[in-house]
Amino acid sequence: ALAVGRVSRLPDGRWELTYYLHNTVTGALTDSAVFTTSGNDVRMCAHRIADRIYTNLTGEGPIFASKLVYVAQLARNRYELVISDSDGGNRQAALQSHEPIISPVWSPDGKKIPYVSFEDRKPIIYVQELATGARHAICAFRGNNSAPAFSADGGTLAVALSRDGLTQIYLMNANGTGLRRFTKSYGIDTEPCFSADGQWVYFTSDRGGAPQIYRQPLAGGPAERVTFGSSYAISPTVSRDGRYLSYISRIDGRFRTAVMDLTTGQNTLVTTTDRDESPSFAPNGRFLVYATEVNGRGVLGTASVDGRLSTRLTGLGDI
């Protein structure tokens, strides 16, 4: 395939981006598009063109026009909740704090971000509106308030709370009402995430000794263990199509990102770094982003679900 493009300035100051994709074997025009935009959106238009090329060549869903949310530590007591393009560019701070911020995640519609802030010297879960910057605390109970995660339909939040003793998984409505306990174990249950079909909640638990990934039906019933190939597994996340589960596996003292095919049960280590954390799938479920440490500095990396492709995002600050 051959991609050809042109960028031109219009008389009204806007930009016009034109692109053509040709089949080099037949010479046929496979795809074309014209984008007209202001200067602020030129790079996003380039990402949309990259998505069209990628989808035409692979048949898979788009990836490049998506957004990242992460926490950067800019100084000893300075933290930022950052929104950026998928390549780390167009970086914007959604929140600044002198206390740690952890566990940011997207709402399914991309309009809200729940996260945990320690600004009041205790962990509190907030939900922030991206359009306005307005936010409200939805979990400020005694003890631990952590690990928020939206259901696929955006109607339910899962959180990890220690309000009744050991940290357990609780569910609530997206507006913070209707809190109810979901797991009941003699261990620590944390890091919940929903399956794509909304039928299961995956989570980390040490109920059997060392931490492992479990899942429990949302409709009720006992939890079942999911991971068996590692003596230590944490931080589950499920792809939007429901095919893959990613998690952090400790192998010979190294914390590496693993991907499980939920249909076959096959596990694949997809990174070569040894301090990975917080994996998250791209919208098309074929790539994921994760945090790791290289030369004593926190960075973001990406990997394909088969481990064949990987890259590192630079210039993002200490993640």
What function would you assign to each model-found segment?
Residues 2, 12-17, 63-65, 76-78, ...:
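Extracytoplasmic
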Residues 11, 25, 57-61, 117, ...:
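Sec/Tat-exported extracytoplasmic proteins
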Residues 20, 82-84, 104, 128, ...:
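A residue-level detector for well-ordered beta-strand positions
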Residues 41-45, 56, 98-116, 135-136, ...:
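Conserved beta-propeller blade repeats
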Residues 66-71:
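Short beta-strand elements that form the blades of beta-propeller/WD-repeat-like
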